[in-house]
């Protein structure tokens, strides 16, 4: 009986990765820093097994600096044993310290012997080891790939110190990724498949997130310790349009995440007891949605779950705690937007009221195309917006020149001042129903534009005519 159960477990591990009931969950463990001689291994193993027990994922991905002391071979056997005991399929990407104790080829020779390891050595003709892509198949169509996981070696150190401290993802690796992406896209009728990427060292673009109000989590390192050379991996992710999120480790005192060019750049949570840093040890969970460019992610430790971040909206479970603006007690009958049109030379939206009031009227939306003047004019738009469901919403106002958006009298977006085309966002928690919306806009000279977009957990659209109603 025991043998039959063992064989059944191994057979299940060798099945293709597949969505279940429309979801696929994985846990990223990073910077385990396993030292076979250390008593800290017991705590590290407890962390891994506790997170697996809490989350019960479909896959674990280890993103580098896994075994970082001798005897390394025994250390890797211990790591493999943990996941085999848990009957958990797992994958591995290399960190900059892993090959200091055992060469990468030998590491992968050992890994592929485990029936629970789903990765591979990767192509020999490109830089690094373990570059591969994992297809995740749909829950209903057994032969249809629904999503992709790219596992990439971010390499170790450059050939000379004048190139910086850390190596980078090389051109032939990027070319390999682009070929894989192109082929999977072609096989999906020309539509890029939703994908994630996992490796060890952060891309230089992670630095763009530091200090932004839309970035969540901690940057206790004070920086993203990336390569000095930017080889263009991120630009290829943008160009190929499949990767939704990138997940790395390396910087133990960072666990922040945010979006750059509509791609999430995220750190995992340091896992190993013997790694430096004060964070509670744990793992980052990522849950994909079948057939959608959507995922949720959060950190889980033996002490429990931390806040969740929802892609693509950028909304978090902290946002959802409120407070929420209550809906107006109105039942408007007519759709539309009331406006007052002004002319004059303005530097701020507030300057409009000192200008010449030319006319008033009703439009179907926030539309400036019917302005009588080409330059030097402004609009005061007023409407009731129908919010379909209670939730947190981002409002994006793209304007040339200035604009301000208010909901229920509260300033949500400040894109004021004379400037070229620029997009500014703001967020607000709203009860379902009607809310007063006021949009101020002015045009100075040389180009005019105004667009308003609303993004919620299940909404991403330009505000449409059927959402707007005339105030009573």
Predicted segments, located by residue:
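Binuclear metal-dependent phosphoesterase catalytic core
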Residues: 20, 29, 133-137, 143, ...
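Acidic/polar, compositionally biased interaction segments
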Residues: 323-472
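Active-site environment of divalent metal-dependent phosphoester hydrolases
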Residues: 35-37, 68-73, 92-103, 157-160, ...
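His/acidic metal-ligating clusters that form di-metal
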Residues: 56-58, 148-151, 163-255
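Hydrophobic h-region of N-terminal signal peptides that target proteins for export
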Residues: 4-12
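Extended active-site neighborhood of metal-dependent phosphoesterases/phosphodiesterases
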Residues: 14, 77-190, 284-290
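N-terminal active-site segment of His-dependent metallophosphoesterases
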Residues: 12-78
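Structural recognition of the beta-strand scaffold that forms the well-ordered cores
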Residues: 25-29, 58-63, 68, 89-94, ...
